């Protein structure tokens, strides 16, 4: 069975507190969602603002393969705004629970039904595909839902949706509810789950078992309050655990996750299922030993299947085999005696409560073996100008030993650190395609001259390195960390 994916990252996802996308941001995400293979892109709510309509129009003009949808209330003015944007469909939402009808709408069931049907008729008269959606359906009278959906079919609704608006479903109740609705409604039924009790993915999958044929999801599970059902979790679970297919190109899940994270400025939790950096990370010696022998011992799927990668983390729980495996992955050969010394230093770091980054491990290797990692690109000069009413600007002069050339570049930024890193990245762009994946400041002591610890993650192709640097000067610490990471990737 093929399950359709209705992505609402650009509507429900953008309603995450603190998130606001520009029209161009919306377009960039929509194009990636289309490449990913979603069936429907809910591009926003056209009535919201002029900027929202501009973003939706950019998407509809792009000629994407996905159906482009706008959220609307059961109001002609909302539908008119959607029509102005030239969308393919509307997600027409009607509150159906007693608490919503009494306190929000101040209407009876009959009045709500009449309003909904008139709105469906109006949208259909104007050539739109209509998905009639019951808001707070899981706290509604199921017989009223069935009546609404069947009456909606009579006036032209194309499909219907059951919304678990406040996330109160359980997997068992979800399957039972959708079984009853699909047995009594002819139209295709969608499921829309929120994650207030952490069960959005499970409830969505159970709804499919009950007969739902389309899942509403968001990338990274973002959304209001605790978020929505996660696209990557739902798609992977349906495929691997239940045997249902979708059109999603699963190998692109990690990439799309990071694009949404960057544009929405919402970091992906390391332990996030499927796309988190720790989703396929291993530290415990027993686990790594099993992994080396057969990856299926501690991984339910191969990370490459979802565009992620396996990571071996070193710390106090690591064993010698894990260390040797990590060094082999990094292309570092050491003797047994050197391996034992490196292992002891790793344990010392771990007992001090320190996480050992790739750069830390290389530093330990250099200390034990006396071998230095070749510095292929050297920072010769760094100048940063910043201040009140001055756009931060930085210039760098680098020496690339590989071709014995000097690289000089200037770049602006939203702050002096951003400007400095942008200048370095711009300077090396002709040498290698290296992307900054993550930047954070982890430890700040007291006082204005305190040491600051900066952590950066850089990516070259599928390789990612993490570097930590400490300095009283945050700009210097940041640039040093980036430079060390670049040299690690070039080696």
From Swiss-Prot:
| Keyword Transferase appears in the UniProt entry | yes
Kindly state which keywords UniProt assigns to this record, in alphabetical order: Amino-acid biosynthesis, Branched-chain amino acid biosynthesis, Isoleucine biosynthesis, Transferase
Any one GO molecular function term: 2-isopropylmalate synthase activity
Pyruvate carboxyltransferase domain boundaries:
3-254
Entry-linked PROSITE patterns:
AIPM_HOMOCIT_SYNTH_1, AIPM_HOMOCIT_SYNTH_2, PYR_CT
In the record, biological process GO terms are: isoleucine biosynthetic process; L-leucine biosynthetic process
Per its record, the protein catalyses: pyruvate + acetyl-CoA + H2O = (3R)-citramalate + CoA + H(+)
Task: Tell me which EC number(s) this protein carries.
Answer: 2.3.3.21
Which pathway does it take part in? Amino-acid biosynthesis; L-isoleucine biosynthesis; 2-oxobutanoate from pyruvate: step 1/3
**Entries under Pfam families matching the protein:** HCS_D2, HMGL-like, LeuA_dimer
Asked whether the UniProt record includes Metal-binding among its keywords, one would answer: no
HAMAP family according to UniProt: CimA
Family of the protein in this entry: Belongs to the alpha-IPM synthase/homocitrate synthase family.
Task: Tell me the PANTHER family matching this sequence.
Answer: (R)-CITRAMALATE SYNTHASE CIMA, HOMOCITRATE SYNTHASE
The UniProt function text for this chain reads: Catalyzes the condensation of pyruvate and acetyl-coenzyme A to form (R)-citramalate.
Q: How does it assemble?
A: Homodimer.
What name goes with this protein? (R)-citramalate synthase CimA
Q: Which organism is it from?
A: Methanocaldococcus jannaschii (strain ATCC 43067 / DSM 2661 / JAL-1 / JCM 10045 / NBRC 100440) (Methanococcus jannaschii)
Organism taxonomic ancestry: Archaea, Methanobacteriati, Methanobacteriota, Methanomada group, Methanococci
């Amino acid at each position: 069975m093929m399950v359709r994916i209705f992505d609402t990252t650009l509507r429900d996802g953008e309603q995450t507190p603190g998130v606001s996308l520009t029209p161009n941001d919306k377009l960039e995400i929509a194009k990636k969602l289309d490449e990913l293979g979603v069936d429907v892109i809910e591009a926003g709510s056209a009535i919201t603002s002029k900027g929202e309509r501009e973003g939706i129009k950019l998407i509809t003009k792009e000629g994407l393969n996905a159906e482009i949808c706008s959220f609307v209330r059961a109001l002609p003015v909302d539908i008119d705004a959607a029509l102005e944007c030239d969308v393919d469909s509307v997600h027409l939402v009607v509150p159906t629970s007693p608490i919503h009808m009494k306190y929000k709408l101040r209407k009876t069931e009959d009045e709500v039904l009449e309003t909904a049907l008139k709105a469906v008729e109006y949208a259909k008269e104007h050539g739109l595909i209509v998905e009639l959606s019951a808001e707070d359906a899981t706290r509604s009278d199921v017989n009223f839902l069935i009546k609404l959906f069947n009456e909606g079919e009579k006036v032209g609704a194309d499909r219907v949706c059951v919304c678990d608006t406040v996330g109160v479903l359980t997997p068992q109740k979800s399957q039972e509810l959708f079984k009853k609705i699909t047995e009594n409604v002819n139209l295709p039924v969608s499921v829309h789950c929120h994650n207030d009790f952490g069960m959005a993915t499970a409830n969505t999958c159970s709804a499919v078992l009950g007969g739902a044929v389309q899942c509403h999801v968001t990338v990274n599970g973002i959304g209001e309050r605790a978020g929505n059902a996660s696209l990557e979790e739902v798609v992977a679970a349906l495929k691997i655990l239940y045997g249902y297919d979708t059109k999603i190109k699963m190998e692109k899940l990690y990439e799309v996750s990071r694009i949404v994270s960057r544009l929405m400025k919402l970091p992906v939790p390391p332990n996030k299922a499927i796309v988190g950096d720790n989703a396929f990370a291993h530290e415990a010696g027993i686990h790594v030993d099993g992994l080396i022998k057969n990856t299926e011992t501690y991984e339910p799927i191969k990370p490459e299947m979802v565009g992620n990668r396996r990571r071996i983390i070193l710390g106090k729980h690591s064993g010698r085999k894990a260390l040797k495996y990590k060094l082999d992955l990094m292309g570092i050969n050491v003797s047994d005696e050197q391996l034992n010394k490196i292992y002891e230093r790793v344990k010392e770091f771990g007992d001090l409560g320190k996480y050992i980054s790739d750069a830390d491990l290389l530093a330990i290797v250099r200390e034990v073996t006396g071998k230095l990692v070749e510095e292929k690109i050297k920072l010769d000069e760094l100048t940063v100008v910043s201040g009140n009413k001055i756009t931060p600007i930085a210039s760098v002069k680098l020496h690339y030993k590989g071709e014995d050339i000097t690289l000089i570049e200037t770049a602006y930024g939203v702050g002096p650190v951003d400007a400095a890193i942008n200048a370095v990245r711009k300077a090396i762009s002709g040498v290698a395609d290296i992307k900054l994946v993550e930047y954070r400041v982890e430890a700040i002591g007291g006082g204005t001259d305190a040491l600051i610890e900066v952590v950066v993650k850089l990516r070259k192709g599928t390789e990612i390195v993490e570097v930590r640097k400490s300095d009283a000067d945050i700009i210097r610490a940041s640039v040093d960390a980036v430079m060390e990471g670049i040299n690690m990737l070039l080696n």
